[in-house]
């Protein structure tokens, strides 16, 4: 709590927010920070109040079907009182609608789209006075198989916002000019007042609570507009705060490109090729878009149409045996929750779980692990079951300190026998010399007989802290070096 940024926090404390026997994931804070929404049993939308820890159901799980974890979608309203969510209504689970549901748990909901096509990824825009979403109602589709092209649409919940959105460039310019004149008059009046009172007024304005949203749903179907000029295989989309431009990722040729549609100029242009599909987040000023794609972060500068990678480092302790153990239990539990029927072929799923779990300690690679999982899932005698694995990418290279060690030394640490010329340990000001014992690498003790190579994994070219003992002088000291 004392750190300014979570990213650079020196100490992290984790504790469970929701404790129950149900599968719970995909949390999202409310905009006012008072509550957290999450999915229970993959499809039930629930909310926990952070103050009293009471949990309520907002959208019953019967209104959705989860084919794979992560395929559900919902979003808080700006006033923290409503949700836009995925919803199975008249089109079946392959053609979902968008539902507006009240967050208080009353069950009040409205099917906003009612199209019979696939409507997805609804987002609040224009301060909650409208929503944008993707729909395949106008796109090409494969009638004999799967897949369809999408468009981005907008639906207005407020008549004034709808009228303002449709203003021409000239009409918008006149409106902006009137606003500038009005703001100038107010500024002149404020300048005549006491400065302290003016500051108090600004503080009061800054702390003004978000006004509850009001919806004119009766006229919503007359306030729907198609925003994209042609259907395509779409990624994410972002509407600017002013509502004058739409940025979206679309794939026409090789991969996803970033496009811009200017509503006042009625122009569509390609901004950046090959940005990749993913999720886009605009900054508060609307000057940049942050794209999360393929495990990478990118910053897109809208004005200059430039994209910059955002470098980050997130190290973790890789324990493949523990990872396989987790995946095994996750697989077994998911079958139990989503697929298993006690009457299916007389299968004892609990018994099979215990029987196949015994193989885990004897498996040391993912190829054999995938085979074992496939055999266990095969006991179900059901279609479309099995497991596969991806070949591991190149493991991080093990760095070298540029020294030979005494193989006859049996104590803790690494006793240096020879230092290689022009290596990491030959700095001009170093006190490390043959005969010294490296006791720790980055604070981790080197025990006798233990493999020290993992301590240098991926450390090439990075600062590494060595804790060294010199038996000749009885001195202990620390030095930073860059292994190669």
Residue spans of the language-model regions?
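Extended, small/polar residue-biased N-terminal targeting/export presequences
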Residues: 361-412, 475-479, 484
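PDZ/PDZ-like domain segments forming the peptide/carboxylate-binding groove
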Residues: 396-449
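C-terminal, low-ordered peptide segments at domain boundaries
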Residues: 172, 305-323, 426-427, 447-484
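A short helix->beta-strand "capping" segment at the edge of beta-propeller domains
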Residues: 8-18, 213-231
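Blade-terminus and WD-like Trp-Asp/Gly-His loop motifs, strongest in beta-propeller folds
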Residues: 27-35, 74-83, 122-130, 237-244, ...
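Terminal targeting/pro-maturation regions of precursor/exported proteins
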Residues: 142, 306, 311-375, 379-380, ...
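A flexible loop/linker signature enriched in serine peptidases of the S9 family
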Residues: 1-6, 18-24, 34-52, 60-69, ...
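A short beta-strand motif characteristic of beta-propeller blades
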Residues: 13-18, 56-64, 109-112, 225-227, ...
């Amino acid at each position: 709590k004392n750190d300014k940024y979570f990213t650079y926090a020196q100490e992290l404390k984790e504790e469970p927010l929701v404790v129950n026997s149900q599968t719970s994931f995909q949390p999202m804070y409310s905009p006012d920070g008072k509550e957290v929404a999450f999915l229970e049993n993959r499809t039930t939308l629930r909310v926990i109040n952070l103050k009293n820890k009471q949990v309520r159901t907002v959208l019953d799980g019967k209104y959705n079907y989860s084919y794979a974890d992560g395929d559900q979608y919902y979003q808080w309203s700006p006033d923290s009182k409503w949700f836009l969510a995925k919803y199975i209504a008249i089109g079946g689970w392959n053609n979902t609608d968008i539902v507006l549901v009240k967050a208080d748990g009353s069950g009040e909901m409205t099917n906003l789209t009612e199209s019979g096509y696939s409507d997805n990824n609804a987002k609040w825009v224009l301060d909650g006075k409208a929503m944008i979403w993707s729909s395949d109602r106008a796109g090409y589709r494969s009638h004999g198989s799967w897949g369809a092209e999408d468009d981005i649409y907008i639906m207005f919940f407020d008549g004034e916002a709808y009228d303002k959105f449709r203003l021409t460039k000239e009409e918008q310019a006149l409106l902006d000019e009137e606003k500038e004149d009005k703001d100038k008059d107010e500024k002149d009046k404020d300048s005549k007042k006491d400065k302290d009172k003016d500051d108090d007024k600004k503080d009061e304005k800054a702390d003004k609570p978000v006004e509850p949203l009001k919806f004119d749903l009766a006229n919503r179907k007359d306030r729907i507009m198609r925003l994209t000029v042609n259907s395509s295989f779409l990624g994410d989309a972002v509407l600017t705060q002013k509502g004058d431009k739409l940025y979206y990722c679309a794939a026409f040729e090789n991969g996803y490109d970033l496009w811009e549609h200017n509503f006042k100029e009625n122009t569509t242009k390609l901004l950046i090729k090959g940005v990749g599909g993913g999720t886009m987040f605009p900054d508060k000023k609307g000057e940049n878009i942050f794209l999360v794609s393929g495990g990478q972060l990118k910053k897109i500068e809208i004005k200059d149409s430039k994209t910059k990678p955002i470098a980050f480092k997130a190290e973790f302790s890789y324990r493949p045996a523990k990872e396989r153990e987790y995946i095994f239990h996750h697989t077994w539990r998911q079958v139990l929750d989503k697929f298993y029927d006690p009457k299916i072929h007389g299968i004892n799923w609990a018994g099979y779980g215990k029987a196949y779990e015994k193989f885990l300690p004897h498996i040391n690679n993912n190829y054999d692990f995938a085979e074992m999982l496939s055999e266990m899932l095969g006991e179900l005698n059901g279609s479309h079951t099995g497991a596969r694995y991806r070949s591991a990418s190149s493991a991080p290279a093990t760095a070298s300190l540029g020294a030979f060690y005494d193989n006859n030394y049996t104590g803790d640490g690494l006793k240096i026998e020879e230092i290689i010329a022009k290596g990491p340990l030959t700095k001009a000001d170093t006190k490390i010399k043959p005969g010294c014992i490296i006791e720790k690498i980055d604070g981790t003790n080197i025990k006798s007989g233990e493999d020290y190579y993992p301590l240098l994994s991926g450390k090439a070219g990075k600062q590494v802290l060595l804790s060294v003992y010199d038996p000749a002088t009885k001195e202990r000291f620390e030095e930073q070096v860059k292994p190669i």
